[in-house]
């Protein structure tokens, strides 16, 4: 059965190593019959802790469709790529969104979050008192 996957890859930060490793990943995807491959470069960031003696890394997210039984072989191929520091592959669940429920829920949240005290206070009109409120400039 063909499923939709989303994979996040962390590569070494050097430009040449990154491009070479990314091409290896894409060739592996083609080899294992992945379709609808969409690549998205996230950026280069500092890592919280060193991974394989690297302090920075480049993130890439790739979405693809593939047979479920090819995924294990694909993961074993990923482990052989030297400049790939980490990867994570998730099954992307596509759900039909019911907009009526969302609209109802948003309205309920809005209704429940209204500060009733501020509404009561806003309806009152303060009448000015004191001599400065009744003074009108005369010519």
Curated annotation (Swiss-Prot):
Lineage, uppermost ranks: Bacteria, Pseudomonadati, Spirochaetota, Spirochaetia, Spirochaetales
Protein name listed in UniProt: Small ribosomal subunit protein bS6
Keywords, in A-Z order: Ribonucleoprotein, Ribosomal protein, RNA-binding, rRNA-binding
Keyword Cell division attached: no
GO biological process: translation
GO cellular component, as recorded: ribonucleoprotein complex; ribosome
Region annotation Disordered: where it falls in the sequence: 120-139
GO molecular function: rRNA binding; structural constituent of ribosome
Polar residues bias: start-end ranges: 130-139
Signal peptide feature range: none
Family: Belongs to the bacterial ribosomal protein bS6 family.
Function: Binds together with bS18 to 16S ribosomal RNA.
Tree of life domain: Bacteria
């Amino acid at each position: 059965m063909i499923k939709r996957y989303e994979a996040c890859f962390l590569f070494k930060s050097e430009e040449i190593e990154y491009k070479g490793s990314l091409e290896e990943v894409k060739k592996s995807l083609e080899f294992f019959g992945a379709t609808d491959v969409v690549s998205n470069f996230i950026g280069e960031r500092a890592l919280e802790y060193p991974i394989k003696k690297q302090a920075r890394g480049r993130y890439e997210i790739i979405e693809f469709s593939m047979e479920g039984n090819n995924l294990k072989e694909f993961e074993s191929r990923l482990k052989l790529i030297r400049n790939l520091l980490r990867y994570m592959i998730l099954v992307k669940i596509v759900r039909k969104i019911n907009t009526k429920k969302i609209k109802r829920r948003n309205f309920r949240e809005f209704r429940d979050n209204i500060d009733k005290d501020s509404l009561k206070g806003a309806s009152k009109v303060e009448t000015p008192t004191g001599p400065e409120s009744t003074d009108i400039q005369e010519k």
